[in-house]
């Protein structure tokens, strides 16, 4: 099921990107998304990844990748050097997510961010009825070994963009194998029933 969710997320991200664009994938993991974008959309893609094993997998696939920490390495990229910057389910793991977002918006003409939605109804129910930090398919780690430092909801990210005058171009909610557009008028209900939020901002 996790692979299905990941494939759906990557398909949504790929659909947001035009053919032949230049993309930086921050926290690119093993390069699965980069590989998809390169093969399906002829995208010139580069990755930034901290984990050495993931970097080796990217290299093995013939994908251009730099090993480094996004919180300390993004300043090296010139302004507007990519058409898009992608950050997939990583924002919540940074110590200073606002600073990272500022760098992404500086580096890319547009930015695509996906987040696990802490406002999903099953997450809320776990906290409400059991009084425990939730463990779900999109939040698979227990509280004591999770990489997540700053959990947020789809609504939180909407509000953040409003406060910082960041233009929201499109938001897609993902739930299992279904997707739906999220607007301000349906934000409350989509925040409740979407496991994942994918934002196109810039």
Sequence positions of predicted segments:
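Alpha-helix C-terminal capping/helix-to-coil transition sites in glycosyltransferase folds
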Residues: 19, 80-81, 107
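Class I SAM-dependent methyltransferase "Motif I" SAM/SAH-binding loop
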Residues: 27-29
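Class I SAM-dependent methyltransferase SAM/SAH-binding core
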Residues: 32, 36-73
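Short conserved loop adjoining the S-adenosyl-L-methionine
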Residues: 73-79
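S-adenosyl-L-methionine-dependent methyltransferase catalytic module, highlighting the catalytic core
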Residues: 98-103, 110-202
